[in-house]
Amino acid sequence: KLKESWDVARIGADAYYKRKSVESFICNFPDQPSSEFCGCSFTPDVTYAENRSDCISLTSQQLINYYVHQMILSEADRDSGEISLFLQPDYKFLFNLLASLNPSDSLKISQIVCVGTETTFTDDHQLTNLKYLHSVFPLYMAGHDYSLYYYYDKIEAHYHSFNLYPCMILTSDAALLCSSDYQTGIFFRSGEVLRMLKNLYISYQEQCTLFFTPAPLTPENHAVVIGSMFDSDFAENDLLGIQPESCLTPFFTGTLLREMFNHDLPNADAILAMAEQAFQMSMDKIKNQQFFIYSTYEGLLQFVRSGRTDEIPEIFYHPLTTEQRIQVLEGVCACCESGAYRFLQKPLNHLPGNLHFCIRGNSGTMIFKNNAGKIFVTSKRQSW
């Protein structure tokens, strides 16, 4: 506590807690489960299904949790379920429930969130916007059809300044409006009310921007995904990345790439040509001192042991042989000597194996595995 107080006084509270928030986001990024996780299937309460009241007042968080629980379970059991959320990602009960679901394949979840225009912190000194981003990632990890929309506003003014029930959860046959602290609310089942709220939600959504859409890196959509990563921002700007293992793809060129590549894939020639061009672009940036990667010794050792990298789905290539691994490590050593590759120190020397993140210009790319082991790529461009 004494050292923390000293650091706050020396650096300044805002700068200190911003850095700690980023550190917390990186160190606690959701990792792929060690064993297969397929979610849970539940059955809605019979009492909830039989209660057909059009309007019910909810006077405690326990009551709200009960109705939210039943709404979500009922919708997840439908053939074409749809859940619409107009609230911040600070309702832990709801987001834990959604992340644990094993719904029908056709369930769609959409959410509208307010992104703060000012730097604000939560009660535990976390950057509000960054904590919200961390809260929604388990839904992507679970493999849900989840779409996140956002708009800019002052969060405090929108949710906490005498606004009557600013939060809404909407399903096919029910709606719940509640306060921002999830303590009181109103539950609706009237068809007329539901149609009005649905139209209102759609009108709001049309005024918002889609935050990002993770795309699976597969042979079928390789062109779109690789193109989003190696775009004009990549070519024109310095690249700064953080990931468990050193970035190895710049060394996958020429004979090595052709030897390790899975030539049995559909469109193999096109995939190989695009990959070689992209990886060569990375090597050119290293030579031009425009490529800086921060990684861990643990991640590099994992590659040494397995001959695999989490940057590329396993379907695209064969594990590297011992000789090929040595060849790649020689390239990594040269990059360490030039300063392009650097190893993280405490407390970031034990990164989650699932985090691969890079920034180039006003764009960012994140690569992660979901609970089923599929690799997804998501890119975000910031407009200033």
Where in this protein do the model-derived segments appear?
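Basic, Lys/Arg-rich alpha-helical nucleic-acid-recognition elements, primarily the DNA-binding modules
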Residues: 1-5
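General N-terminal leader/first-domain-start detector
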Residues: 7-62
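Hydrophobic protein-protein interaction segments
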Residues: 50-384
